[in-house]
C-alpha cells in the first residue's frame, strides 16, 4: 500500500465536532506510522433563509436563519495496513459526515 493515498473529507454543522474528529484521525494515522497532510480547512458553506413571520400582511416582518457547513480534508500519503485497520475501527461523532477515497 505504499503507492496509494487515502483522502478523507469531513463535513459537519458544528466546527467543534469536526475539529475533534480530524484530531482523532490525524492522531490515529500518525500513531500507526503513516504520513499525514492536513487537516486542510475547506471553504465553509453558508446557507441563508429568509421567512415571513406573518402569514398575511406585514411584509417587513421577517426572520432570517443561517446554517453553516464546515468542511475539512485530510490526506494520508503512505498508509500501512495498521493505518487502514485503525481507521476502520475508529468511532467518530454522530454529527460528522465522512467520505473516504483511495487514490
Curated annotation (Swiss-Prot):
In Pfam terms, one family for this protein is Ribosomal_S10
**Which GO CC annotations does the UniProt entry carry?**
ribonucleoprotein complex; ribosome
Q: SUPFAM superfamilies annotated for this entry? A: Ribosomal protein S10 (SSF54999)
Task: Please give a single GO biological process term from the UniProt record.
Answer: translation
What is a GO molecular function of this protein?
structural constituent of ribosome
Q: Which NCBIfam families match?
A: PRK00596.1, rpsJ_bact
Q: How does it assemble?
A: Part of the 30S ribosomal subunit.
Regarding protein family, the annotation reads: Belongs to the universal ribosomal protein uS10 family.
Q: What is this protein called?
A: Small ribosomal subunit protein uS10
* Species of the source: Colwellia psychrerythraea (strain 34H / ATCC BAA-681) (Vibrio psychroerythus)
Amino acid at each position: 500500500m505504499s503507492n496509494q493515498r487515502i483522502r478523507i473529507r469531513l463535513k459537519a454543522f458544528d466546527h467543534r465536532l469536526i475539529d475533534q474528529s480530524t484530531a482523532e484521525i490525524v492522531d490515529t494515522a500518525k500513531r500507526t506510522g503513516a504520513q499525514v497532510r492536513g487537516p486542510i480547512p475547506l471553504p465553509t458553506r453558508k446557507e441563508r433563509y429568509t421567512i415571513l413571520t406573518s402569514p398575511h400582511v406585514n411584509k417587513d416582518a421577517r426572520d432570517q436563519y443561517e446554517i453553516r457547513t464546515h468542511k475539512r480534508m485530510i490526506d494520508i500519503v503512505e498508509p500501512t495496513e495498521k493505518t487502514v485497520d485503525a481507521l476502520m475501527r475508529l468511532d467518530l461523532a454522530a454529527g460528522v459526515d465522512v467520505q473516504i477515497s483511495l487514490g
